[in-house]
A protein has these predicted regions:
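Structural preference for solvent-exposed beta-strand-turn elements
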Residues: 1-185
Length: 185
């Protein structure tokens, strides 16, 4: 099984999702990896810890099947960042001993990176109604537009923590953002 993706799009996605991947002392070892979920229409990359999770999606240039795997962020991201913009093919391979790895193929070479079993990753099930948590999904451009609209009113001095930053209010049908400098809201 293999898929092809634009190296620049994948690099940007990995950098954005990777901000939540713990680099050391992960309470669950699988969380120190990216979770890749590939279909013919989309490539989903998830990263996070036990309290927060981020998932990004890009479209593959081509894909010949579905696959799920865990992969360490450092070797993958460091290698992809060093490549010029080009198609990057990632093929799942299995050794005779049963070990799996991703074979990254590009115009000037290749790299093999071991991968783990995606079933070890903490499930991304919708939170139950009894635990009080909610799941929200939104377009990143909508979130950026909301933050950009309220950020001019944010109080710049960190000595008054209650006025510093942007406040998020999650309601059942929308997300409200608020900021104040004690003059404008």
């Amino acid at each position: 099984m293999k898929f092809t993706v634009n190296s620049n799009e994948l690099s940007t996605l990995l950098q954005n999702v990777g901000r939540l991947v713990p680099t050391s002392n992960a309470s669950i070892p699988a969380l120190a990896n990216y979770l890749f979920e590939v279909t013919s229409e989309r490539i989903s990359v998830t990263g996070g810890d036990t309290s927060m999770r981020s998932t990004g999606v890009i479209a593959p240039l081509e894909s010949d099947g579905e696959m799920r795997f865990l992969i360490a962020p450092t070797p993958l991201l460091d290698y992809i960042k060093s490549l010029p913009v080009q198609p990057l093919t990632m093929a799942m391979e299995t050794t005779e001993e049963g070990a799996r790895y991703i074979h990254l193929i590009h115009s000037t070479g290749y790299l093999d990176i071991p991968v783990g079993d995606a079933d070890l990753y903490v499930s991304n099930e919708t939170p139950g109604a009894t635990d009080g948590s909610v799941m929200m999904s939104m377009n990143s451009s909508s979130l950026l537009a909301g933050i950009s609209a309220v950020l001019p009113a944010a109080y710049p001095d960190t000595s008054r923590e209650q006025l510093h930053g942007v406040h998020f209010v999650m309601l059942t049908d929308r997300l409200e953002l608020c900021a104040t400098d004690n003059v404008q809201l």
